[in-house]
Amino acid sequence: MSVGNSCIKAFDFARCHVMVERGLSREECEGYVMKEIDFYMVDAFSTETFGGNAAAVCPLIEWLPDETLLKMSQQHNQSETAFFVTTDSGFELRWFTTQGEINLCGHATLAAAHVIFEYLDYPDTTIRFETRFVGPLAVTRSGDWLTLDFPGWDSEPVLPPPLLLEGLGISDYQQVRVARDYMVVLESQQQVEALRPDIHAMIPLGKMVCVTAPGEGEYDFVSRFFCPGEAVAEDPVTGSAHSMLIPYWADKLNKTQMLARQVSARSGDLRCQLVVDRVRIGGQATTYLIGKVLLR
């Protein structure tokens, strides 16, 4: 324990002792004692600082009230914060944005697994997470790579809403599909990279927007992911979007193992595999910050 933490604990103990002497119950006193929570900020899907997609990660002893988790996420001011608690079978995992809890987040799952493997003396090569909305998830480590095992999502072709094309600023496209999000397929990587969308104009769509195209060089496909109505206009690297992208490109390219790149400003590489109705999404991660959250 550091000197600073020792001083904090000593101060809280002394303050609690005084309150008890003044007639407060031990339970009332505990409400004034500071809680210490480990805090990590991790760049997921990258080996370089400021690359990939940043996520905050907080291991918890037990679940805090949802209101507290949301306020913590707002204070962290990252696109997502991953919270987890240890269970008999593994870990229970939840994700919060600055606006509320979400059903799935790939890069924050990768970041949480990175923290468990690197800092919590986890002995196995596979982590099993229980989640509230998408069931069990697994993350496996092999060397420096972490592989997410996520559900695959089939998408259906649709006629594009005019607001979608107008917001993206395009008239030519190969196909528009929909699953959890809209998926717009373009002809080339250059077209995806050149997009300058009007994010605000797409808010009435009520969905996130993924744009994809065949990749160049070693990459089988590329993508970008836009978030109308969210705090972050463009998500730098979106693991969960590949639950939709991998089944599509596996069918299109007639291959089950692929290398993908999300061509945002921060960018990131993803190893992709389709296994029946599941997808495996591989990435690397690097720690940017380690600290303490102090709650009263």
PLM regions: where:
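Active-site proximal loop and beta-alpha junction motif in alpha/beta enzyme cores
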Residues: 34-105, 110-296
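Short, low-complexity, intrinsically disordered N-terminal peptides in bacterial proteins
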Residues: 26-36
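Aromatic (phenylalanine/tyrosine) cluster motif
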Residues: 11-13, 32
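Extreme N-terminal basic, low-complexity initiation segments
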Residues: 2-9
